[in-house]
């Protein structure tokens, strides 16, 4: 089997996808925008061969690299990146080289535009926040008057919470509108008073779920990015209603042999026009592995290896590795801009036995993950909550 992996070096832990394939005898052929010496020994060791291209947006260069791999290795079975940014590139390569596994360009359009994602949720019978694609400030103001403030404005196609703004009144909406890139289509949504819960997992070729877990995000990514808030997320087993909704979404897309990451809101209070407290609303779909250190959180929470489960799904179309939910795993990220009561040494003294990883975050991911972060294990909700309170306690104001 031959697999081309786009940008295997970023994020830094993604080499694990390549390593599990190579360990099973797969030729893993990398194409990336970092020189060979810069991608790190673990990544280098996970690859059969690597082609450095200074700019992966140079499609002619990428095309030539793929063609050369095919000339020397034969048929390519999969094109993968597990990275939202490169999904369109993955799809274009599949089309140009007639690689039948994985979505083509028409399908990735539905997977990368928020408006089309919401239509897919609605087709599956899952409600969403009301939304529009405003073509003018007047359109945006009319929508806000119809649904009520606050409203959220963000690119219809985009990764994470970048360029996302909230407006609590017409003056703020005008400011957010003027700050947007006029060459980019934005989507406007009513604000949802809730928190994010995800349904994440891996499928086989019949879109059966081989593995699933859930992330709970009490502080929205938008607030973490725009307001410099602390970053917290928990890994736990999916609730039954979340799992059922997630499986309905799997039927709406080409989700054969993929790692998926589906986002939902759960209402924290009743809201007219949306539902009662506890209602699930569709937010976004991501047809790739969840970002940050979520795959590693899954491994710790389930005593498993999701990279292996993913590799086995591609090669054997089965899951061999066991893994049941055992414990809560929490990502707690602190921002350098915030003064905290406890030092890192004090945190280690109290919670060291619970820390499974502690790390500095890559600069490109600081807004979403914090500057310095911990992954901690907890056997109960009470212990989990105490960890978060202790690590994020602020210094007393003078």
What are these regions (language model features)?
Residues 190-255, 259, 266, 270, ...:
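ATP-dependent carboxylate/phosphate-activation module, predominantly the ATP-grasp catalytic core
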Residues 127-129, 146, 150-153, 162-198, ...:
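Conserved ATP-binding module of the ATP-grasp superfamily
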Residues 15-19, 118, 141, 177:
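Short amphipathic alpha-helical segments and helix-helix/interface helices
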Residues 50-57, 132-136, 165-168:
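Short acidic-hydrophobic, aromatic-tinged amphipathic segments that line or gate anion-handling sites
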Residues 134, 164-169, 202-204, 267:
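Short beta-strand-to-turn element immediately C-terminal to the catalytic PLP-Schiff-base lysine
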Residues 94-163:
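A conserved helix-loop-beta module that forms one wall/lid of the active-site cleft
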Residues 1-104, 383-397:
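ATP-binding N-terminal substructure of ATP-dependent carboxylate-amine bond-forming enzymes
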Residues 309-398:
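Peripheral (often C-terminal) accessory segments that flank ATP-dependent C-N-forming ligase machineries
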């Amino acid at each position: 089997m031959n697999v081309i992996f786009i940008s295997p070096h970023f994020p830094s832990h993604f080499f694990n996808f390549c390593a599990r394939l190579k360990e099973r005898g797969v030729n893993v052929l990398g194409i990336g925008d970092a020189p060979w010496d810069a991608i790190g020994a673990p990544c280098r060791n996970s690859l059969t061969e690597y082609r450095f291209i200074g700019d992966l947006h140079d499609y002619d260069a990428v095309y030539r690299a793929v063609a050369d791999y095919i000339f020397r290795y034969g048929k390519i079975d999969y094109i993968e990146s597990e990275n939202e940014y490169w999904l369109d590139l993955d799809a274009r390569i599949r089309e140009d080289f007639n690689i039948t596994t994985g979505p083509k360009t028409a399908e990735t359009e539905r997977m990368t535009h928020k408006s089309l994602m919401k239509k897919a949720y609605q087709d599956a019978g899952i409600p969403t926040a009301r939304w529009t694609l405003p073509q003018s400030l007047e359109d945006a103001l009319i929508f806000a008057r119809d649904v009520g403030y606050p409203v959220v404005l963000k690119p219809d196609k985009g990764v994470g919470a970048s360029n996302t703004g909230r407006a609590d009144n017409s003056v703020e909406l005008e400011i957010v509108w003027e700050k947007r890139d006029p060459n980019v289509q934005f989507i406007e949504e009513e604000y949802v008073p809730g928190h994010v819960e995800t349904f994440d997992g891996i499928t086989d070729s019949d879109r059966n779920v081989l593995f699933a877990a859930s992330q709970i995000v009490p502080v929205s990514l938008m607030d973490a990015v725009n307001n410099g808030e602390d970053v917290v997320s928990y890994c736990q087993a999916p609730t039954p209603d979340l799992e059922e909704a997630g499986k309905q979404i799997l039927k709406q897309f080409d989700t054969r042999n993929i790692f998926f990451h589906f986002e939902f809101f759960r209402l924290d209070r009743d809201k007219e026009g949306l539902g009662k407290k506890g209602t699930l609303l569709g937010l976004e779909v991501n047809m790739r592995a969840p970002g940050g250190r979520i795959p590693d959180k899954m491994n710790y929470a389930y005593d498993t290896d999701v990279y292996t489960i993913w590799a086995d799904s591609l090669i054997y179309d089965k899951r061999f590795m066991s893994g049941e939910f055992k414990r809560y795993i929490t990502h707690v990220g602190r921002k350098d801009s915030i003064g905290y009561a406890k030092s890192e040494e004090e945190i280690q003294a109290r919670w060291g036995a619970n820390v499974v990883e502690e790390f500095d975050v890559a600069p490109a991911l600081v807004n979403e993950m914090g500057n310095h972060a911990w992954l901690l294990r907890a056997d109960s909700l009470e212990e989990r909550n105490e960890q978060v309170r202790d690590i994020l306690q602020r210094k007393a104001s003078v």
